[in-house]
Structure formats: structure tokens, C-alpha cells
Amino acid sequence: MVHHDGADAHAGHAAPAQPPMKSDTATPKLNSEVELGSLPSEAHNDIMQMARVGDITGMEKLFAAGEYDATYSDDEGITPLHWAAINNQYAMCKFLIDKGAEINKKGGESVATPLQWAAQRCHYYTVHLLLQHGADPLITDSQGYNTLHISTFNGNVLLIVLLLHQGIPVDVEDAYGHTALMWSAYKGFPACVDVFLRWGASVHAKDEQGFTALHWALVKGSPGCIQKLIEYGADRFAKTANGKTPAITAQELNTVAAWQKALDECGYDEHGNAIVPSWPGASYLLQDRRSFMTKFTFLWPFVMVWATMVVMAGMPVFVGIPLGVLAGYAVQWVAQQVIAYAPPDMRQLQKTPWMAGIFAGSLFLCIMNWLLHIFGSTMFGQDSAVIPNLLFAFFISMTIWFYIRCMVDDPGFVPKMGGVAEQKAVIDELISLWKFDESNFCVTCMIRTPLRSKHCRRCQRCVAKHDHHCPWVYNCIGVNNHRHFFFYLINLTLSVVTYDWLTYRYLSTLSETASDECNILAPSLCRIVNADTYSLLTAIWASLQLTWVSMLLFVQFVQVSSAMTTYENMHGIDNYSATSLNSSFTSTGAPLNPPSLPAPGPSPAAGGARHGGRHAHGHNHKQGFIKQWSRLLGVDAFIETAAGRGATTGKGSKRNKRGNPYSRGCVTNCKDFWCDPSPMFGKHENGAAVLGGVPVNYTDMYESPGVMTSGGGGRRRGGGYESVAGEEV
């Protein structure tokens, strides 16, 4: 029996190696040697050669001679349309269809249609053309595969999304009962599995041997596929016709490690049973795990910061510092044990509100210390400091206000479509504009992505004018809350400065009667430390925050004056003509209007593990400790900007060589940002902003500023700028 991967699978075999085919018929001869090799020079082969290379002029002459027409087929039933489709000759396909080519004609050793030939090579522009002219995606070849099955073999997510929007049943089976979900799980394409599951594919469907998609995912052992299926409720104990459970299948195929890892990530033990913690009230608290974990990881850092401060303040320095660090680590260890029961996407502290909780806890302790100790001493004492106290009260109030706004407000999520019909209309429009690619369409949100937007994997939404995802506010910073974020940083800086000054005044007065005995410090410093160690530690801890806040403020000031976001500064702005058009024509072959468009490049990568530059959802490699904290604290952006390597300051950088289409000069850029008429304390209209003094909305801005100001329409090709692309900030 012939298989795609050369493996045998018999109905009675202990474990599957590959879904069985319908017959022993080989797949069509679609290798590069057949496509690109020299064809015989007989007249009946010349028509195929012309179709293969897209020679429309020659084809017209051949038809004019009257010997052949568009319905011609060879002895195997292969038509010119087959060869044009598989070689991505879009213009030739259009020409042949207009000349009456039989669009659903079967041919070749696999007895497949031109649509299936195009789908096998992931030529989704050609696929769309054929579908628009009546190609039937449900026709099967000699092995029982329809177009959706064939498209799944290569894992191209955009092609699968295109086909699903044509009304193809997502659970349609091949000759042996395999669904597209089973094939994508077997092939190890997590992105495809995710698309099918979100589209409603059944995780309980079984093939003729009784295998579910979960059984097939264990063949390749892709943890992402296995985990996603379990998350969507796949039966962990489903038995095949031979009584094989997924656990037995994993053992026979040596994929036990991937199986158990996926179970653990989803909250199950190695036997597939739900793990319930033994601590009191666990069953009640974990009824809504996500809600509980969000609240717990935000509030528990309050305890960690307080415990660390109290231990350090209450003991001698040589003992207090190590014990304080140990106390903080112990509290964090408890949190790590608790989040072991969190949803899969919250199993790491940096993916929870933990960092936001550390800041909020620190802020709370400083405010309480000011109210209980510093305020009374410095406000009503002999040498009162009324104005500094009032200033601190104002700055800290503004810090709290803008911090909450940054955390809870919509950062500028791009609205999703109302249904499948609207999504299909968007896809059809993008294809008509030659823009149906990873940079212009988000397969997770199923929307057209506006300029400067980016899909955030943490928020699972596309954010308009995305700046970065900030773990300290547990939210994205986008067009709606960017200015609030800036004011939060400014007021935080002023709050720390005034708090330090008030603490100094407070300790100076208190130290006059304090003991001057300590281990290593001078008597004058000993009196300050002994006066109120806890207040001194809170001031030191608050001052430490000025390091990352100062760097972040510097970077933000530079970027605002240059009309750039953090993401654009770190990754640059892609040029429209150099990226989008080249990407689109790698999928369309010969253009309908050759003089106006660039030549096609290499074929785009399949989307199994990664289906787009900006919208990549594959697994990232683990970063080192220093690099991870460098990103969390904004040190990497500061170094890039200060060293002149960022897009805002790098003069010779490739990322900056085409200039910034959003910049209108430093003064105008700052005016656009700071004088935005959107209310500071009221509700912000989603996506509203100002660009060059002109109101714009970044949730539906699809043309570059140059095109808009020149009055260009949606089909303008050259000189514009495309959406930014890359991985999460």
C-alpha cells in the first residue's frame, strides 16, 4: 500500500502509522522533474507546455489554428488547465476558463481536478479563481480525498481558511473516515488543528478503525496538537476498534513524553484523570480556574513584597537580607505550586498578572507607609512640608488612575467580524487586491489587519497601533491607552522623587533621637537606619523602580517624537511594495497585468507551525534569564535606542532606510500625541488618533498615509507601507 510518508498501516495493526489510502494508486506525478523537465515536441504536448509556462500568446495562436481548444485532454485526462493550475499560472488559468475549459475535469494517475492540483501546491490565489468559476471542492480523487483533505497535507493555514469559507463541511470524511482534523493532527500542524477546532470540528469523530484525532496526533507526537485537542474536550480514554486508548497508542509509538506533557499542561495526571489539589476549598475556588488564578496571582505578590520588607527591616543586615530574599522566594514558590493548576496559558508567572501584582503591592505599601508614618510627621511637625505632601498626594493619585486605566481599558482591539459571511467578504476583497497573505489577514481573529496593528498572543486579539504588551499592567499598550501609559510613567517618576524627599525629611527628624549603634556604617548613617528601617527600605525599593522607569521614559520620548511604536522601533517598518506584493505574487504566478507588478519569488512557507510573520503562533524558543528580564524591564529597547541601532535613531539601518511614513516632524509628531482631542478621563473612541493634524482611526486604516493624502484608492500598488511583522514584544 502506497502512503505519503512511505509507512504501512493495516487495519489490524497494533497502532496506526498513517491513515490508510483508498487504493494502491500512486499520487500524481507532480515533482519538479515532471513540471520543469523538457516535454516532447509533438503538437499535442505543445499545448501542455504552453499551459505550464503561461504562454498565453502561443496558446491563442494554437486555438486560432483550430486544431485544439481549451477542452483538450491527453490520454490520462489531463488538460491544459491542470498544468496551468499546478504551476500557478494564474493568468493562463483565467484565459483557459474564459475559453471554455472544463473546470472539474479529472485527470492524471490520481484522477484529480485542476482545483486539487493547485491545492496540492498551496496556490490559494489560483484555488480561489477556480472556485469562483464553479470548481467543486467536494469532488474526490482516486484515493478519496477532496480539496480540503489535500490542502491539509501541506498545512497551509491561509488555504484552509479560504476553503472553509466556501461552505465545505469541516468534518467531511475521506474514503476511510478520516477528517481534515485527523490529518492535521497526524501531520503535526498545531496551527491547522487550532483553525479546525475553532471552526467546530468534532474531536469525537472516529475513522473506520475507531481512531480519533487524538490517536492520530500521537503518531507524530506534536505536543501542541495533543494539548489543543485535550483543551477542546477530546476523550482521553477513547478506544479504537482494537481497544487501544490514547495512552496505549502513545506507548506503542514512543510518544509517551509528549502525551504526558500535554496532559500535565491541561491539568491531568499521567493516567488522564483530573488533578484536584488537596488544600481546603480547592474544589470551590477552582470552579473558574482562570478567574481565580488571575485574582490570586495579582494579590499574592502583595504578601511577597510585604514579607520581604518586614523580614529585612526587623533583623540585622547580615541576617535580614538573605532571610528577606528567602522569605520572598518562599512566597513565590507557593504561587508556583498554585499555578500548576492554572489553565495551560497561565502556567508561567510572566503570563499572569504577577508582575502587575508586584508593582501594585509595592505601590500599596509605600502609600500606607506614607499615610501611617511619614504624612503625620512631615505635615504637622515643627518643620512641616505641606506642599511636598500635597504634591505627592496628587502625583500618586494620578499614578493610580492612569495605572488602572492602562490595566482595564481596551488598548485598541480591532473589532472582529460579525459572522462567516463578513469574513468571506473580507477574504474575497483581499484576494481581489492581491493582499491575502499573513501580513494583511489574521487567521486567529479572522480579520483584515490594519496598518501598524499586531496580533498579541497574550491577549489573543489584534491591537491597533500596537506599542507593546506590558506585563507590569497586564495589558497591551495600543492606540487607546498609549497616552495613559505615558502619563502613568511620568506621574510614577514624580511620585518616587517626592516620596524619597519626604522620607528623607521624616528620617532626618526621627534620627536625632535614634541609636547610632550598627555593624558597618558610620554613626550618622546608623541613626538614619535605626530611626525607621522599614520606611528606609520602602524608599530604597521605590527608588530602584526609577531605573527601568527612566529607561522606558527615555525610549518613549524618542519614539513619540519620531512617531514610532516600540515594536516598530525594534523591528522596523516593512515597505509595502517590497513585502506585500512580493508575498501575494508568490501565490498567484503570472500576473493578470504583468507590467504593473513584481515577479514572483519563492513559494511561501506552509503554515503548520508558523503561518505568518506578524501573526506567528508557533512555540518560541526559551529565552535566557538575562534576556527575559531585559525585555520585561525594557532594557533591550533602551540599549537599541541609545546605541543608535533602533529604527528611530539608526541612520544606516536597513529597517529605517525607507523612512517613516507616519512621521511629520518632531513638533507635529509630539502635537499629534499630546494634543489628541480624545478625553483624558473619559471614554476613548476605539482606534481614534491624530496623524499630521488629521483625525484617523487605526482600527480600519489599511492604506499608508502617503496613499491617503494623495487620494489613492484601495488598489494602489507602489510606495506605501505595510503592517509591521515579527514576533511578540
Swiss-Prot record:
Organism of origin: Neurospora crassa (strain ATCC 24698 / 74-OR23-1A / CBS 708.71 / DSM 1257 / FGSC 987)
Top-tier EC class: transferase
Annotated GO MF terms: protein-cysteine S-palmitoyltransferase activity
Protein name, entry field: Palmitoyltransferase akr1
UniProt similarity note: Belongs to the DHHC palmitoyltransferase family. AKR/ZDHHC17 subfamily.
Compositional bias ranges of the Pro residues kind: 592-603
Keyword line: Acyltransferase, ANK repeat, Endosome, Golgi apparatus, Lipoprotein, Membrane, Palmitate, Repeat, Transferase, Transmembrane, Transmembrane helix
Residue ranges constituting the DHHC domain according to the UniProt record: 440-490
InterPro entries for the chain: Ankyrin_rpt (IPR002110), Ankyrin_rpt-contain_sf (IPR036770), Palmitoyltrfase_DHHC (IPR001594)
